Amino acid sequence: MNPPALAPHAPDHVRAISRYIAGKPIEELAREFGLDPSTIVKLASNENPRGPAPTVRAAVAAAVAELPRYPDSNAFALKAALSRRLAVDETQIVLGNGSNDILELVTLAFLQPGDEAVYAQHAFIVYPLATQARGARGIEVPARDYGHDLQAMRAAVTAKTRVVFIANPNNPTGTWIAPAALEAFIGSLPRDVVVVLDEAYNEYLVPTDRAPSVEWVARYPNLVVSRTFSKAYGLAALRVGYGVMDASVADLLNRVRQPFNVNTLAQAAALAALADADYVEESRLLNDAGMAQLEAGLQVLGLRYVPSRGNFVLAQVGDAGAVNASLLAQGVIVRPVANYGLPQWLRITVGLPEENTRLLTALTKALRG
């Protein structure tokens, strides 16, 4: 097929971008294999298998009455709640259509052609995609034990570097950086380099392992802390995340964001979710038990895996394409990660106990051929 006539007129850096590959939807697999959607187990996208709290469901139902009206562009109530929870001024908070939005807003505000952004090998693939979209150059630093090599990343920072991305815990490998090492790295960076600390999986850490990253913003005005309601809070479908940063940085991001980037239902859901800390802690404990179940099962199968601090585990299965195809045929969805430079590995989300059992049974069959 001939390319559309307009394609040659798009910038080279746009045409060079590889599209983001999302986890396969349940409905898509059901269509492909003629399966009953209710029998499919999806462990591909690091979603909370419990879903949102009952209070969140009620808040969303109540907010439906506001559908004819535009959302509050400044999300007053949600920002106020986050301000109280995090002990920061509301002017330091930027809301996003998922935390992806925060990452992209940083690149929109601070990157242009000729600039560089630094990130680790095997880190979240949105970092290079968002960098490429601005015509900037991504500098991928080789991983160390599947995680961030902070010394090498610091050495990769040059006069052209405008942004550095760090994920803690890292996706898709699940590695974690101790707070002391993380702060030392942030403190070593030039103050004119924006460092984005992506904490999408922060709530899955044992509380004593969580970095006081929001407090660091006062010391490091070039720090942006990004978090999401998509994971532990169970709001993936509603797309709401937030960033905490110096007010001057927040002002720039608010200048380039869409005016209604977080919808009314998402704002209501996030506000209710934030108020239910017990539900999030219960989700963390369930995840810990599920992780132990998966790790034990992988050990029985003799599979190598990367110890994870998130709600997922990366397992080396050999011919990942063939194993994944077998899992799909059995109605189990996991995440191939060849596009992360890990062609022999699959990322498996921690599910409910019965979902984990289903995965391990299907994986056993897939490995036996």
Which sequence ranges carry the predicted segments?
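N-terminal small-domain helix-loop-helix segment of the aminotransferase-like
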Residues: 2-98, 105
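Short acidic capping loops at alpha-helix termini that bridge into adjacent secondary structure
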Residues: 38-39, 89-93, 113-116, 160, ...
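PLP-dependent aminotransferase class I/II
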Residues: 53, 74, 222-306
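PLP-dependent aminotransferase-like
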Residues: 109-166
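Active-site pre-lysine segment of PLP-dependent enzymes
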Residues: 132, 150-160, 172-195, 199-232
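Conserved PLP-binding catalytic core of the aspartate aminotransferase-like
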Residues: 288, 297-330, 346
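PLP-dependent enzyme catalytic core of the Aspartate aminotransferase-like
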Residues: 326-330, 335, 339-369
